[in-house]
């Protein structure tokens, strides 16, 4: 299977998604847009598209960030959805999926940084690929915004600070506002790059300290993500 990663910043890690793909021997390709790497020309280049997070918004312009082309990424997402590829968006990536499908990004009720529980909705509890997450499940977070909802979208998980943590947009299309891919190394990269943001955010409701983030064990969350990815891949192969 061919997995393509779109990464927006050097400090945004593919984390547990990369380990999953490597451990299963899948073919991995990259668009590290911060380094000038191009997006795939079309959806024929991959079976699964994973679009990661970043400090940008789907509304960020080329003038504001020359290496981030929101329109081009949304076009690629639309191509992938039309071609019935697996599409997963994380944080900014989930917001790009919503925008690509016509649903505007919006501000989350709360800023969340660190690890906090998500709760499965009734749809999530019944979902064959999500129900094994259990409810509640503590996962990683680092965001201000949340994805828009199309008429066909289904919210599968929410948190106290954000009502759109996991959204299904189609049979093989999922947006994760939360970060189940976080590892100790991935979080450390964000911490090192975000000193001022963390200092400014301390005291807000859903902000962990640096010490708490460094000490938390991300393994259980990663394992539940890997099972979701395995089951999604199996379902896609049987379509």
From Swiss-Prot:
Q: Which InterPro entries match?
A: ChyE-like, Class_I_gatase-like, GATASE
Q: Which UniProt keywords apply?
A: Glutamine amidotransferase, Transferase
GO-annotated cellular components: cytosol
Can you name one GO molecular function term for this protein? Answer: transferase activity
Domain annotation Glutamine amidotransferase type-1: ranges: 1-200
CDD domains linked to this entry = GATase1_1
What is the name of the protein in this document? Answer: Putative glutamine amidotransferase-like protein YfeJ
Q: Which organism is it from?
A: Salmonella typhimurium (strain LT2 / SGSC1412 / ATCC 700720)
Q: What is the lineage of its organism?
A: Bacteria, Pseudomonadati, Pseudomonadota, Gammaproteobacteria, Enterobacterales
């Amino acid at each position: 299977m061919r997995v393509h990663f779109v990464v927006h910043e050097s400090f945004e890690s593919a984390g547990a998604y990369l380990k999953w793909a490597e451990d299963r021997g899948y073919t991995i390709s990259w668009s590290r847009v911060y380094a000038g790497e191009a997006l795939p020309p079309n959806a024929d280049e991959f079976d699964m598209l994973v679009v990661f997070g970043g400090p940008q918004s789907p509304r960020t312009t080329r003038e504001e960030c020359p290496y981030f082309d929101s329109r081009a990424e949304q076009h690629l997402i639309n191509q992938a959805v039309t071609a019935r590829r697996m599409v997963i968006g994380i944080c900014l990536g989930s917001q790009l999926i919503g925008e690509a499908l016509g649903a505007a990004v919006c501000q989350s009720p709360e800023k969340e940084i660190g690890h906090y529980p998500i709760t499965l909705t009734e749809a999530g509890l019944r979902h064959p690929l999500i129900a094994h997450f259990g409810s509640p499940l503590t996962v990683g977070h680092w965001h201000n915004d949340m994805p828009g909802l199309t008429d066909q979208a289904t919210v599968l998980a929410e948190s106290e600070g954000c009502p759109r943590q996991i959204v299904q947009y189609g049979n093989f299309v999922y947006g994760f506002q939360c970060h189940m891919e976080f590892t100790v190394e991935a979080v450390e990269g964000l911490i090192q790059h975000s000193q001022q943001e963390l200092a400014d955010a301390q005291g807000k409701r859903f902000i962990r300290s640096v010490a708490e983030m460094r000490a938390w064990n991300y393994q259980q969350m990663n394992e539940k993500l890997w099972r979701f990815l395995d089951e999604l891949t199996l379902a896609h192969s049987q379509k």
